[in-house]
Regions:
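HIT superfamily nucleotide-processing domains
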Residues: 1-123
């Protein structure tokens, strides 16, 4: 996809957490061109269907967008989204952040690189 990048960041706390980024500097969602909006719809559809394929079920997720804090131009800001599916190895094995993970460091069942490879195969 030439307008968007989806990646599993090396700092991911959730096993199949992804970061969605436009390939050009954009500070607000309303700055997307029509082409980028259509491409975003396609990328999101592919990503969410990939999660469903990976877990062989309708996969729940939480998604949030980070744009510049106000409508003023913000060339130092990069619009991006985070997608967090709370599943580990199957639709019946959920990830729960507790104790140590909430206060210190996330525990991973697989590396971000392994998660990215599995997700790539599901796409």
């Amino acid at each position: 996809e030439e307008d968007w990048t989806v990646l599993v960041p090396y700092w991911a706390m959730w096993p199949f957490e992804t970061l969605l980024l436009p390939r050009r500097q954009i500070d607000h969602l309303d700055a997307l061109t029509e082409r980028e909006q259509l491409a975003l719809a396609q990328v999101l559809t592919r990503l969410l269907r990939g999660y469903n394929t990976l877990f062989d079920a309708s996969c729940p997720y939480t998604m949030g967008w980070h744009g510049a804090p106000d409508s003023a131009p913000a060339p130092h800001w990069q619009l991006h989204a985070h997608c967090y599916p709370p599943l580990l190895r199957s639709a019946s094995v959920r990830k729960h952040m507790v104790g140590y993970e909430m206060l210190s460091e996330a525990q991973r069942d697989l590396t971000p690189e392994a998660a990215a490879q599995k997700l790539r195969q599901a796409l």
